[in-house]
Amino acid sequence: MGSASEQRVTLTNADKVLYPATGTTKSDIFDYYAGVAEVMLGHIAGRPATRKRWPNGVDQPAFFEKQLALSAPPWLSRATVAHRSGTTTYPIIDSATGLAWIAQQAALEVHVPQWRFVAEPGSGELNPGPATRLVFDLDPGEGVMMAQLAEVARAVRDLLADIGLVTFPVTSGSKGLHLYTPLDEPVSSRGATVLAKRVAQRLEQAMPALVTSTMTKSLRAGKVFVDWSQNSGSKTTIAPYSLRGRTHPTVAAPRTWAELDDPALRQLSYDEVLTRIARDGDLLERLDADAPVADRLTRYRRMRDASKTPEPIPTAKPVTGDGNTFVIQEHHARRPHYDFRLECDGVLVSWAVPKNLPDNTSVNHLAIHTEDHPLEYATFEGAIPSGEYGAGKVIIWDSGTYDTEKFHDDPHTGEVIVNLHGGRISGRYALIRTNGDRWLAHRLKNQKDQKVFEFDNLAPMLATHGTVAGLKASQWAFEGKWDGYRLLVEADHGAVRLRSRSGRDVTAEYPQLRALAEDLADHHVVLDGEAVVLDSSGVPSFSQMQNRGRDTRVEFWAFDLLYLDGRALLGTRYQDRRKLLETLANATSLTVPELLPGDGAQAFACSRKHGWEGVIAKRRDSRYQPGRRCASWVKDKHWNTQEVVIGGWRAGEGGRSSGVGSLLMGIPGPGGLQFAGRVGTGLSERELANLKEMLAPLHTDESPFDVPLPARDAKGITYVKPALVAEVRYSEWTPEGRLRQSSWRGLRPDKKPSEVVRE
């Protein structure tokens, strides 16, 4: 079979509308499956793919297709399964081009089992293997809402956690939720089914009013059916990232557990999923970590004879890595050209560039995408004999390392942006696929000259909420989470500017930090960090930060370096930015707190011991992504906090009867604020008086909440425009979406209402 590099799929009827309600075309579907290939393939590779096709659109009849048609392209991987009624040959989708073929077939849905094919020793014949994961399909009965599904999902997660298994949630794209659990050791499909059934039955016993494990539909009204049967070797489940053939183009979308706590949880559309992937990557990355990887050197080997050419021809499959070397080789072949190669995932991704990379931004040069080369080729120089592929002399013209801004080298949506650091050539380059294997190479302006890094437009990178206990120090660095205000700082040879997380210039609000200008007078830097006020124990205090005066000692604790003396560092790995930051601190009086010791669990314990707010874990290889909340940064706090928007207030009783007694809290949603309860605990008399003064000009007769408030909460309320952001502590979210046992922490003038999301 041909390698993925040789495969070609021609899209026909590109403008055919497959989702009439949204006008989504076949071309849109083609682009979607090309866009999700990198994250989806690991979850379907090695598994037989059953397709559900809507050739005439979702408003017309569909049909399931298991048997691979004789007209299918020969390069598609395939294997045969014996059924009672005969044998069926299934396609195995293990390449981006295979997914493109799926789209060309208008096979909107891809269904796979929980087992993979395994090769028989000796013969190499593929046969069904053991299950590598569990799946639970949470199917809502009549009247069941998403919040109830999420409640059951958390119960399943907790049961599996008791036996040492981790669970990942997926909104199905239809009505329900899917839960996936990777198995440390594969088990038979029968064994997986037995385990899943026991979990479902145990859940039914614990939650009889909400859960059923029985397939009888008449028993499902008002309950969640925990379908365990899809672990059977003969059954399939809609694959993660697959489209659904419904009225709208929804997707079986991986979610975070924090999202399942959101009462507004809903199914996601394909365009939303693409945005999430660009921001967060694959949320199911740990589900199929052992997925089979295609040998990317198959085509390279087939084009060469080791007995006739001095080129390196390794026999082993390449091992995926995170190296970042590049090489440009001058190739005196029949048509002289330069070969540009970038190390990626264990191979050298390669282009033949007739005129070499351009040396200015005003021209584009043609680049032909060629077969992947082995890493050993990066040091190859020599003469390829006449009559052999690529005959001619090869000389290394330049080599070095590169930073990645974007790397999509698939045959359909290719775009690569890198920053080269070589001896003869340096700078930012983009390679963009135009048609087939034809790409354009373009030199970009240096990132420091781009608008994206203008300090006034820079937004801080944000962390996702999660647990750090299972994270290892070999891959993650652990910082303390400080109880202060996030600041971006620009110090430029004696001048300093400060910006809040929301983008406000707050230089005048922190006269105590003017000393940074003198400390960093020899440099032009942009720093990310936290402004803190320490209590008598030397611990950052949020309340003292809130009530600081001009004479209060405010410190700036830096934890990231984004720009240094003419070089933008956004595309540089965290561990390298950290080294530069520590070097800068050693040469100045800049405060850079030390990293926490050990793995995640030890770091979290250290943070608790010192009375800090929590821990921020950062992948050592992560790049800085301005304004994005990314899974490569994880925050884990010792107590629950939530930012809220104030939507109204109620007068107090007794000594508070003339002023504010409690505040109405909300979380911004599409139709207004989603009511999150009231808070009065923790407010001092001084704060109450200040709040009354601040809220007076915001008075409105219209409720800012998306639905009418319950009578007990609406009584005696004065509504205000949703302009002020505050932070509260709480014990838990109730099923109704209220904060239980909330207590006031303070206003957050550094935050905009539009930034507030449910944690």
Swiss-Prot record:
Region spans: 3-phosphoesterase domain (PE): 297-446
Cofactor remark from the record: Binds 4 Mn(2+); 2 Mn(2+) for polymerase/primase activity, 1 each for 3-phosphoesterase and ligase.
Effect of H373A: Loss of exonuclease, no DNA repair
Binding sites annotated in the UniProt record for Mn(2+) 4: D483, E613
Positions that bind Mn(2+) 1: D137, D139
Effect of K16A: Loss of DNA-binding, no polymerase activity, no effect of gap-filling (in Pol domain)
Reaction equations catalysed: ATP + (deoxyribonucleotide)n-3'-hydroxyl + 5'-phospho-(deoxyribonucleotide)m = (deoxyribonucleotide)n+m + AMP + diphosphate
Phenotype of the disrupted gene, per the record: Not essential for growth, 80% reduction in NHEJ (in strain Erdman).
Region (Disordered), start-end ranges: 740-759
Positions with a binding annotation for substrate: 52, 111, 137-139, 172-178, 230, 236, 244
Biased composition (Basic and acidic residues): 747-759
Record site: Transition state stabilizer: H373
Gene Ontology BP, a term: double-strand break repair
Cofactor: Mn(2+)
Impact reported for F64A: On substrate with 5'-phosphate, 1 bp complementarity and 1 nt gap, greatly reduced DNA-binding and gap-filling. Barely detectable activity on substrate with high complementarity and 3'-overhang (in Pol domain)
Keywords: ATP-binding, DNA damage, DNA recombination, DNA repair, DNA-binding, DNA-directed DNA polymerase, Exonuclease, Host-virus interaction, Hydrolase, Ligase, Manganese, Metal-binding, Multifunctional enzyme, Nuclease, Nucleotide-binding, Nucleotidyltransferase, Transferase
Effect noted on mutating Q230A: Wild-type filling on single nt gaps, impaired gap filling on more complicated templates (in Pol domain)
PROSITE patterns: DNA_LIGASE_A3 (PS50160)
DNA-binding region: 13-16, 26, 53-55, 63-67, 71, 83-88, 104, 137, 215-220, 227-235
Region described as Ligase domain (Lig): spans on this chain: 460-757
Assembly: Monomer. Component of the NHEJ repair enzyme with mKu. Interacts with Ku in the absence of DSB via the Pol domain. In structures of the Pol domain with template DNA 2 Pol domains are bound to microhomologous DNA complexes to form an end-bridging complex. Probably interacts with Mycobacterium phage Omega and Corndog Ku homologs (AC Q853W0, AC Q856K7). Interacts with Sir2; may form a trimeric complex with LigD during NHEJ.
Role of this protein: With Ku forms a non-homologous end joining (NHEJ) repair enzyme which repairs DNA double-strand breaks (DSB) with reduced fidelity. Recognizes, processes and reseals DSBs, including repairs on incompatible DSB which require 3'-resection, gap filling and ligation. Anneals the 3' overhanging strands from opposing breaks to form a gapped intermediate, which then can be extended in trans by using the termini as primers for extension of the annealed break. The preference of the polymerase domain for rNTPs over dNTPs may be advantageous in dormant cells, where the dNTP pool is limiting.
Family recorded in the similarity comment: In the N-terminal section; belongs to the LigD polymerase family.
This protein's domain notes: The N-terminal Mn(2+)-dependent polymerase/primase domain (Pol) functions as an independent domain, binds DNA, is sufficient for DNA-directed and non-DNA-directed DNA synthesis and interacts with Ku. The central 3'-phosphoesterase domain (PE) has exonuclease activity probably constituted of 3'-ribonuclease and 3'-phosphatase activity. It does not function as an independent domain.
Protein name: Multifunctional non-homologous end joining DNA repair protein LigD
Species assigned in the record: Mycobacterium tuberculosis (strain ATCC 25618 / H37Rv)
